[in-house]
Amino acid sequence: MASIIEKAPTNDQSGILNILEDEKAQSIIELLNAEEQEEIAEIMGYPDDSAGTLMNTEVFTLHESITAGEAIKTLQDQEGAEMVFYLYITDDDDRLVGVISLRALTTTPSSTKLKDIMIKNIHSIRPETDQEDVARIVAQYNFLAVPVLDSDSKLLGIVTVDDVVDVIREEATEDFLRMAGAGKDREILLKSSWENAKARLPWLFASWIGGIGAASIIGRFENMLANIVALAAFIPVILGMGGNIATQSSTIIVRGMATGRVNIGGEIKLIFKEIKVGLILGSLYGILLGVFAKFTFTSAPDNLGFVVGLSICASMVVAATVGTIIPLILRKLDIDPAIATGPFVTTSIDILGVLFYFLIAGIFLKI
């Protein structure tokens, strides 16, 4: 095992050791040479899920004063260099001062100095940067690697795109588990029934509150239901359609936040876009459900179909709006939208859907 650890990249070394028992990991570390032990100790000292634990410290660097021809010859002598798509340029103090792509290097006259062709505006991260922020930067700028710098701008290592792909998958899985109210542990299938129950309890409690609220509203309109029993038949449809479109809208927004696609300042445009989507879908399904109600419940009032159709349309517009606004509000309050969006949306839609349905019925059916 020690020989495997020794040959692995530094970020993989810490990953392997972290999944082992402490005593086993320590015994393996003691078999490594002093330099390897120091590097592993440094990597494992960074916070969990940070850039420091992802980075590879075996980075190929070049001095800014050498020429492109000298750089190519130096590169040819390197074996096992990590990610040579980018060449990192340093100064006399080993500070990172620029970066050059491999393509730019090979298409530049051999006598040109690196400092004259390097890109000086560098997107870098600190070792403490959260891995989700690292993934967002890579996705936003389509980088193959991102340099990790200390407070003195010295290059500590790089986080490569292959490591970021793993992070994106892990974070997406975690967010979806949270939104579904199933906790955030990616290994949830390995947990006990009791641990799974505890993870799901808060989300289901919020749904229970929404159900109680909806039941209370229905109770207030029991006379209306007694006069027109057909109204009760469409309550599940209205709540179901509203809940579904709210979940769709909130999922789009939460994932957009996680990937950096939803930017601060564009919220109003986003809200109106989802309202438009809700109106289009609500009108379509409202017409279909209204026609169904009209020809199925022939003994009910003539305008029952109109009431049902309008209610489903209003419910879906409101649900799409709520599903969009709640994650945005939670972000403003520094509350993780992935955790809290589901309960708030579920509770709100249950109550608002029933309320709008009976208010519209009361107005147009004159009850």
Q: Where do the model's predicted regions map?
A:
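Alpha-helical transmembrane segments and their membrane-interface boundaries
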Residues: 65, 172-321, 325-339, 343-347, ...
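Cytosolic regulatory modules rich in charged/polar residues
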Residues: 1-235
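Active-site His/Glu-centered metal-binding helix of metallohydrolases
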Residues: 351-352
